[in-house]
Amino acid sequence: MSNLAVKYKQQAQEEVQIQTPPQQMVQPKAKAKITRIEKLLYVAFIGFLLYACVAFIGNKAGLYQVNVEAATIEQKIVQQQKENQELQAEVEKLSRYERIAEVAKKHGLEINANNVKGLK
């Protein structure tokens, strides 16, 4: 019988070993911690990007405003040139010899060829 008791003990030990498989030591992976300096650098970089975006948009808005003003000034220049041409045509029309002679006769003046000087 002692043999049976030994067999029973061996079976119990085998069952215990079967039930509990050998545990592997799982090493937890260490998280890569972000240091304060890295956080500061990330925040500074994001801040710089935001500043660059705002500055870029501001410059574009300023450039648009300057272009609008330039177009307005060009329009005024064209209008002034057209007005100058019309006034120059009127000056040429009013300074014709026939018109001056007619106004002179109307006021009782006579043309004396010796006193006439050409101007240009």
Swiss-Prot record:
The keyword Lyase does not apply. Essential cell division protein. Its main location: membrane. It comes from the Bacteria. NCBIfam families: ftsL_broad. It is a single-pass type II membrane protein. This is Cell division protein FtsL. One of its GO terms (biological process) is FtsZ-dependent cytokinesis.
